[in-house]
Amino acid sequence: MRARQLGITLGLGTPGPFNAITDVPGVRVGHSTLNQRIDGRQVRTGVTLVQPRAGAARLQPCFAGCHVLNGNGDATGLEWIREAGLLTTPIAITNTHSVGAVRDALIAEERAELGDSGLYWCMPVVMETFDGLLNDIWGQHVGARQVGEALACAESGPVREGSVGGGTGMICHEFKGGIGSASRRLPAEQGGWTVGALIQANHGQRRELRVDGYPVGRRLGDIPSPFSEEGTPGMGSIVVILATDAPLLPHQCQRLAQRASIGVARTGGGTEDSSGDVFLAFATGNQDLPPADYARKDLPQSTPLRMLNNDHISPLFAAAAEAVEEAIVNVLLAGEDMRTEDGRLVPALKGERLLAALRETGWPGR
């Protein structure tokens, strides 16, 4: 179930055909999911991977930028993006304690895949949120096998949402969270560009939850919360990946990443000290950036670029905010009930219950 299937149309923009990050040409998404008992412990975790282009990211770099709304989180590879403005690897999302293992596995995959003697370093982007309530996070069950599976199955088309990949054990606004996606396509007179969002949602308090601007969370307090006896509501994080085919430069990608904060705020998130809210945006509009291989001596001294004029960038900002907002609602509607190891229920938010809560707040529908 997704927001639009319930008649919840967020914002003014129009989604792409998949209403997902994969509406940006060349972008692919893959998941590897662990949902089983291992050595007597419940394991619910995995890896979600975004390939920014149809070819190898190192050979076809993208301009990129990042933004941190609240820094109680971790991510590898972002310092070089801040410095050089280039995304040269796939982007992986996993749980907090598996960042290093996923990074190492991506490095090994890169070396084996390219096999170029000129390739001498790789700094993959790996992002995380904490799934320790529903997953044996200390067991560090994610490794090279899961990374390989996510790479192998990365594809365009509809994106699987909810309890899948890195989002398998996540909690959002005290409901079952996980992976979500949405997109917006600008009209031709605004460039026809697409902005897509993919999120891993593990954040937010229920009482703060808003959908289409209406405070539905206050109408959902009778549904059990996994934090009623232990833990702090809102503890957790949200990771956002934004993709666009607009010809943005790195500083413009950073500006786009900042607008993810608006989508998070519209749904009632973004105010928790314990949340790691890390956002990355990349742009595929410049197709011929030189390969990111500093051992080569035959690269040109300069490369012609295209840039979207800032006078025309505001519709992209609006599209990014709307896509993130809708992706969060899609996460909530894609959930399934789960229980913690000690028996606490992490409930899914059912579509009919969300609609009832919306109507109670005076939501008119559209």
Role assignments for model-derived ranges:
Residues 1-366:
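Alpha/propeptide regions of enzymes that mature by internal proteolysis
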